[in-house]
Amino acid sequence: MADPAAESIDASSSRFGRVVCYNQTAMHGSNTISAAAPFFMTQLSVANLTYRILYYFLKPLCLPPFVAQILCGLLFSPTVLGNNEVVLKLIFPYKYTMLLETFANLALVYNVFLLGLGLDLRMIKIKDIKPVIIAIVGLLAALLAGAGLYYLPSNGEADKILAGCMYWSIAFGCTNFPDLARILADLKLLRTDMGHTAMCAAVVTDLCTWILFIFGMAIFSKSGVRNEMLPYSLASTIAFVLLCYFVIQPGVAWIFNNTVEGGQVGDTHVWYTLAGVIICSLITEVCGVHSITGAFLFGLSIPHDHIIRKMIEEKLHDFLSGMLMPLFYIICGLRADIGYMNRTVSVGMMAVVTSASVMVKILSTMFCSIFLRIPLRDGLAIGALMNTKGTMALVILNAGRDTKALDVIMYTHLTLAFLVMSMVVQPLLAIAYKPKKKLIFYKNRTIQKHKGESELCVLTCVHVLPNVSGITNLLQLSNPTKKSPLNVFAIHLVELTGRTTASLLIMNDEAKPKANFADRVRAESDQIAEMFTALEVNNDGVMVQTITAVSPYATMDEDICLLAEDKQACFILLPYHKNMTSDGRLNEGNAVHAEINQNVMSHAPCSVGILVDRGMTTVRFESFMFQGETTKKEIAMLFLGGRDDREALAYAWRMVGQEMVQLTVVRFVPSQEALVSAGEAADEYEKDKHVDEESIYEFNFKTMNDPSVTYVEKVVKNGQETITAILELEDNNSYDLYIVGRGYQVETPVTSGLTDWNSTPDLGIIGDTLISSNFTMQASVLVVQQYSSANRQTAENNNQEPVQGKAKTDHEATPFMEDEDDEVEHQYSMRR
């Protein structure tokens, strides 16, 4: 038998017989379920799926995303699913949590970088000292209360009490600005004085929290005890802050300005920027503070107005928030143990600490409101908003847990407290803060009541750039003069997405939009502003103020109506949700835009018009903009009777007086036979007949010597004869624009038999007929609805505060965020 000692050993094999030089990777292993990479992919999928499901079910409850984030983590805590055998073996085994934590921390670094990147302090200008006082007093009260509450659940380790108290107190006092802004946007409070004060106070609180957190990390070492290298750590941290401000910020700006050609930023710039995040994070880690500090400071160092900011946000935001950040929430949940805490801390003690956590900022803010002469209900609302927590609170807690300054009990207790605080903020605000709706009394809510030689205030809305040309040409046709000018408020409606903060930003030379729009949206906003400005420049009778309204589609109609009320508009002009294609037909359109139009028409504080643009953007109309073209513009007004038709007649009448406008008013009169067979429709017609006769008589009397006006009456028996008469009009004349009344849910003898065929409620019977495929004409159609208080929801009569006085309509208006602050009486606008 051969001597075992004499046996040769293969150098390519380990002592366990594994072939070292041919060791298979995790992706190609024979048992893939035990490899790290497949486990990580499983964890990533489970984390994302869980977060999305929780967020989907919590969103209707008006809870912020932070609640879903915490619940996502707690779901996999040891108390819930963390100790489940299947979860431990197949999803979150202990030996593969290191890779999970690595990617979670990397996601956190880049997420904090995006927070710094999106924090533009110029966005909110603090005019007075009120928000600063509220922020400082609230933060100090939270720090003191946090220090006291720290000793109630558990005393912690004796040598780490100071460090634990610091982390606990800072996390207790922080406020999350992005979630606070989202809550204000959902409740339509962004433009109120209370909302402005709360956002300013949140910004101050965030900055103070960052300063305290940075210095706290420098004071205590990684083991949770006093840092013996404190002087060097503080000096190096301060030096890095100064380096970012005086070297990195101007250096990055210089590099971008000298390497970016033609406004095009290449991927190389983005990759170098992302590498800079890692480098700065490493530097602050070496300095003795958390790595996220460097990422945050580097984000602040990127030039605010440079296109690189938007590119990085577009590339990172959705991927981080939707893919990688749920891993961080899972890590937070795995560190919490509710069952262990329940065995150590009584339920009563937990209730005391949680209740105190909620009340401390509310009480301190209400105390400040007494001395600052702010209504107590506003102080209650601001105090509730200051309790808004977010990712920063979890970051502070995890930093304390990493250093062992916070034990499992402390960590779990404060995590649950944050969950409760975030859950009660929005419901408490919605219940306790019910600001009275501003009801401005003004007479000219309709064009019919508008005096000819006074200013006509029109609120126009556009969704996309193609909507603009038709609307501007219609405004030009509206005969604006110095004696009867048009004051136009043009709104570009932009959907509020996950990475934008809702606000109304006035776009002029002094205040360009600073919200982080995508490049396409911002460029489109600039082009829209330029086109409306051109309308103003080329006509002395037009004043234009262009606004970008960023809000969710679900509440966009409320923004339009509130702004119309604020500006005392007497006419809202909306684009039809379908656009004309190259072959002259209307496309399928946008169903969401159609819903917005219908909601505006139901709740508008003034008259509304919907423009179906089918040719007003052509050359023949565009040449009219510069007053060098004298081609006649043929306009037809179809009068069937009713308040909407009288309003349409008033708008068409306003166009009279221009050399190039030829107006034809066609009144459809029911025959005696039609009145007999119409039944109830005839009764309704007779009620309005006297008022219709007066309007027609006044129009004919004042335009009888005007050769540009033609009045025609046609006697018809039913709706079918009305359609036939309209077809004959189109055969004998080529009209550029039809103006009709909506006449919604009103059947007259001249429209009998057409109601069942009305497929477009927002256009009415005649408007729907004019744009149908049965008509070969390509004329545009303006459908007008007259304001009627009876048509508005009766709920608007409740909880209203009458406000006398005229709203600001100056052309040189200031941003809404800088409106005058009335210390005597705070008046707010809010959707019910």
From Swiss-Prot:
How does this protein lie in the membrane?
Multi-pass membrane protein
Which residue intervals make up region (Disordered)? 792-832
User: Keywords of this protein's UniProt record, alphabetized?
Assistant: Antiport, Cell membrane, Ion transport, Membrane, Potassium, Potassium transport, Transmembrane, Transmembrane helix, Transport
Q: Where in the cell is it found?
A: Cell membrane
Name one molecular function that GO assigns to this entry. antiporter activity
Gene disruption phenotype? Mutants display a reduced rosette width, a later flowering time and an altered leaf K(+) and Na(+) contents. No defect in male fertility, due to redundancy with CHX23. Chx21 and chx23 double mutants are male sterile.
Primary localization class, coarse: membrane
**Cited Gene3D superfamilies:** 1.20.1530.20, 3.40.50.12370
Tissue expression, as annotated, is:
Specifically expressed in root endodermal cells. Expressed in seedlings, roots, leaves, flowers, flower buds and pollen.
Function of the protein: Operates as a Na(+)/H(+) antiporter that plays a role in regulation of xylem Na(+) concentration and, consequently, Na(+) accumulation in the leaf. Required for pollen tube guidance, but not for normal pollen development. May also be involved in the development or function of the female gametophyte.
**What family, per the record?**
Belongs to the monovalent cation:proton antiporter 2 (CPA2) transporter (TC 2.A.37) family. CHX (TC 2.A.37.4) subfamily.
| Protein name as it appears in the record | Cation/H(+) antiporter 21
Question: What organism is this sequence from?
Answer: Arabidopsis thaliana (Mouse-ear cress)
